[in-house]
A protein has these predicted regions:
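C-terminal accessory regions
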Residues: 301, 305, 639, 692, ...
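N-terminal pre-P-loop "Q-motif" helix
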Residues: 521-539
């Protein structure tokens, strides 16, 4: 789902001016949408109540009061983006020049302070990110006076184009926001074929819902920033100035009722000054406003037309009108969504930002030549062809009525929200907006749009008062954060119990045993040796290790395991995900299982712990409190030492609760800080930047070291990606291509598999598994945990060594286990659990596909080559040709 708001810069008003001109002209001729009319408290204060004119929309974008012409927001003058060029080619040329002349620092190339400043500006631009740019004047000076070359050598015609705009300035303000409120498809279908009276009632109901949503945003989401003792603080403003534009169809010509609300980015604070709105506060309340709109719309349409609704999709907040909720019918009239999904699949992208980009990339002009009468006649015919005629449409408008929530329903809803599957199911804290959002999706249809809002807000206040505990406040945004007593009590009890075990004296290894192990492994670094000493000698019931990316923590855990076992302890290994247990197995842990399996075995008494047991949990920072707490309870009752290993700054917990972080703050942790994975210093710094949240700096480092390739055409990108994969494959580097979307993964797998088959690397016999076919020699990835029965985990890479087509089994050799293992996969495992392994889905937030040789995956040397233009994709080459960063 796309984010229901878009920031609009100065200069983007042409679309809205077109809306004004066309809508006014075509509305009265029966061909266009209804004209936009002013809404909001700010508009009312300014006396703006009628239709918006083109001049008034221009005033909105120019930061003026549309009524008086008074200047509200001052221009933010910046160099025209068209007068800038990418800094990366210039920096690369400067580095080459410095290498030729034996100069250590790039500014030393300059013959004057001014030119040295230009050099530093290029360096700063690259550090700002891969899209860093510099003024064309800087390019011209450095090219001619430092590099002694014509700037066209580096930039070609792009230099001439930028030179034409040198010295120009533009207003870089965000002038307005476009809030889009969309109705469910069944509402659009009812409007398409329901007749004039139904359409009037639908329009009135949607207008009521819009009033509810905008009113909520005005009270809770609109404000300005003001300095308070040297830091920004949120302050409320007097309301919004908006212009809604109603639309009845999508760009694909389908029925699609939605409203674009143009909101001026200006607010007057209590001090009387006009400034830009606090966008962070606005975004914090957007989803609640969007789902309140849908709840209010359901109430209004039930009140006006008697429609009844399906259950609400908790993810989208939408419900469909009963009788128009058939999935096939909805998909038949959703061509626009299909266009966006196809574009995302082709580009290999996903997520909110990608969906917004897809909406823009696939945008086509609406057909404005068709009259309103003709449009509705066409839709009526199409609905009839789909089996929805006049009788069916009349049948959905029956005696449906909203109602207030009953006491029993309310208690059940509050209990659910405050329980493990409620607001803290996947996050440890929440805000008032989160509560309103959740209630808008859970409460029954209200008697009216206004009561839908009142009901949600009142119940939210009760929930916060009776079922929540305030745990913090964002002073700048003025937003309180809450948690549930249930989760806090679990975390509090867990930390208290672990604290009481600090002097328990369990799991202690004799000093001479520890020394023997460390002497055997003289390559252990000081931080690794100190960690082994600490966890084996402390005697604490719960010990923690925080290992930075590339610090060799799993290998160091193997040393600790060796010491414990040498002194007679039974060591068990566990991890939140199956593939992480494989890493423990590679380091000598003979008894490993997932945390879910471990908890199940303990609860069903299939596994017993005692004082001579040691439990090592890798990637423990990924565990939510509700899984970590019972695990520690079992260990405490048995007197078992627990070693939790992870990095709370590298991986967030999968479930709610920062249990690992809370324990680390109270108990402390051994730290593994030395990056042993990356070889070059700049790479180590880049990884540290990622860990510290400075992603832009990390990307800038890759750009500065020429690790980023840009493609304008997706096919060119994919060809380069496969070429890199093939080169690494021929070099026996066992490469894997990573991509975001399943469709792109499947396409790349097909290409790679066909390439190997054409070169005679695959067997002739094929085993069909679903819609896939496998041959001997194929690389596969296993998709399910079967540690006990087969000894394989979800995510295990393997190569097919034999097929038994009649019995539908395959034999595979694992590729990343040390040593490799041969496993026969039975029929029950194959279906849906074995997929081609040349390409896999990428779950980390990288911008596109990546080709990673085995050495790169194991050592972290894997280069992202991002393409920030239309492709938004990346590829990488072999570490033999380039060293590269770790993905964490």
């Amino acid at each position: 789902m796309a984010l229901p708001v878009k920031a609009l810069k100065v200069g983007q008003e042409s679309y809205w001016l077109d809306q004004i001109a066309r809508n006014r002209e075509e509305y009265f001729s029966g061909r266009g949408e209804s004209p936009g009319r002013f809404v909001g408290g700010d508009a009312a204060t300014s006396g703006l109540t009628g239709e918006a004119s083109a001049e008034q929309v221009q005033a909105i974008f120019r930061g003026l009061d549309p009524a008086s012409g008074e200047q509200r927001c001052q221009p933010l003058w910046r160099a025209d983006p068209r007068s800038k060029l990418s800094a990366a080619p210039l920096l690369a040329a400067l580095k080459d020049k410095a290498a030729e002349q034996g100069v250590g620092q790039l500014p030393e190339l300059a013959s004057s302070k001014a030119l040295a400043g230009d050099v530093r500006s290029v360096q700063a631009a690259c550090k700002a990110g891969a899209s860093g740019r510099v003024k064309v004047e800087t390019v011209e000076r450095l090219s001619r006076k430092v590099l002694s070359i014509d700037p066209h050598t580096l930039f070609g015609e792009a230099f001439d184009q930028a030179w034409q705009h040198r010295g120009k300035r533009v207003d870089a303000r965000v002038a307005a926001f476009d809030h889009c409120f969309s109705s469910p498809k069944s509402v659009s279908l009812l409007a398409a074929g329901g007749g004039d009276r139904v359409r009037r009632e639908l329009a009135a109901g949607r207008a009521e819902a819009l009033t509810v949503a905008l009113g909520y945003l005005e009270r809770h989401g609109l404000g300005v920033r003001r300095d308070h003792n040297g830091s920004d603080r949120y302050q409320a403003t007097g309301g919004l100035l908006g212009v809604p534009f109603e639309h009845r169809m999508s760009r694909a010509g389908d029925p699609n009722a939605h409203t674009h609300v143009l909101v001026q980015n200006a607010g007057r604070g209590p001090d009387g000054r006009w400034t830009a709105l606090d966008s962070d506060r606005l975004y914090a309340h957007l989803m609640a406003a969007d789902h309140l709109y849908l709840a209010a719309e359901r109430a209004a349409l039930s009140e006006r037309l008697g429609v009844q609704w399906t259950g609400v999709d908790v993810r989208s907040g939408a419900a469909e009108i009963i009788g128009l909720d058939d999935r096939t019918l909805i998909e038949r009239f959703s061509k626009r969504s299909e266009q966006i999904d196809e574009w995302l699949a082709e580009q290999g992208l996903s997520g909110i930002k990608a969906s917004s980009a897809a909406a823009v990339a696939t945008r086509a002009p609406k057909d404005r030549t068709e009259s309103e009468e003709s449009v509705y006649a066409r839709w009526t015919r199409e609905l009839a062809d789909a089996g929805v005629g006049e009788r069916e449409l009349a049948g959905v408008c029956s005696d449906g009525r909203g109602r207030l929530v009953s006491t029993e329903e309310l208690d059940r809803t509050l209990t659910d929200l405050g329980g493990p599957e409620g607001l803290t199911a996947s996050a440890s804290t929440f805000t008032r907006a989160d509560v309103v959002d959740a209630l808008a999706k859970r409460l029954p249809v209200a008697p009216s749009a206004r009561e839908a809002l009142t009901q949600a807000e009142q119940v939210a206040e009760r929930f916060l008062a009776e079922w929540s505990v305030q745990v913090g406040r964002d002073q700048r945004l003025g937003i309180e954060r809450y948690s549930t007593p249930e989760l806090l009590e679990r975390e509090r009890g867990m930390v208290a119990a672990a604290t009481e075990r600090r002097e328990e004296g369990c799991g202690q290894v004799r000093p001479e045993v520890v020394r023997t192990v460390l002497d055997r492994h003289a390559t252990a670094g000081p931080d690794q040796a100190a960690m082994v000493e600490d966890v084996t000698r402390s005697g604490a019931g719960v010990s923690l290790v925080r290992g930075h990316a590339g610090s060799g923590k799993t290998w160091a855990l193997g040393l600790a395991r060796e010491a414990f076992e040498l002194d007679g302890y039974q060591v068990l290994g566990a991890a939140p995900i199956g593939i992480a247990t494989v890493g423990l197995g590679d380091e000598g842990f003979s008894d490993v299982r997932t945390v879910d399996r471990l908890l199940s075995d303990l609860e069903k008494r299939r596994l017993e712990l005692d004082v001579r047991s040691v439990l090592v949990v890798d990637e423990a920072a990924m565990l939510g409190t509700r899984k970590l707490a019972p695990l520690l309870d079992h260990a405490e009752r048995a007197g078992t030492k627990v070693l939790l290993v992870g990095d709370d700054r590298q991986f967030a917990s999968i479930d709610a609760g920062g249990g690992f972080r809370a324990l680390r703050v109270r108990l402390g942790a051994s730290e593994l800080t030395v990056n042993r994975r990356q070889i070059e210093v700049w790479e180590q710094r880049a990884i540290a930047d990622v860990r510290d949240g400075q992603v832009e700096q990390a990307v800038a480092a890759y750009a500065e070291h020429e690790r980023i390739r840009v493609f304008d055409v997706r096919d060119d990108r994919d060809r380069a990606l496969v070429d890199d994969w093939w080169q690494a494959h021929q070099a026996k580097e066992e490469p894997v291509v990573y991509a975001h979307r399943r469709a792109q993964v499947d396409r790349l797998n097909q290409v790679c598999q066909r390439l190997r088959a054409d070169h005679g690397e695959l067997g002739a016999e094929r085993l069909a598994v679903g819609d896939l076919a496998f041959a001997v020699g194929d690389r596969v990835v296993l998709g399910a945990n079967a540690l006990k029965r087969l000894g394989v985990a979800n995510g295990t890479s393997a190569e097919i060594t034999a097929l038994d087509v009649p019995r539908r089994t395959m034999t595979v050799r694992t590729l990343e286990a040390d040593p490799p293992r041969t496993v026969r996969l039975p029929t029950w495992y194959l279906d849906g659990e074995v997929r081609p392994g040349q390409s896999r889905r990428l779950t980390s937030p990288m911008p596109g596909p990546i080709c990673a040789p085995k050495a790169a995956r194991n050592s972290g040397r894997c280069s992202p080559w991002t393409a920030p233009r239309t492709c938004r994709a990346s590829t990488c080459s072999s570490p033999a040709r380039r060293s590269a960063p770790t993905f964490i």
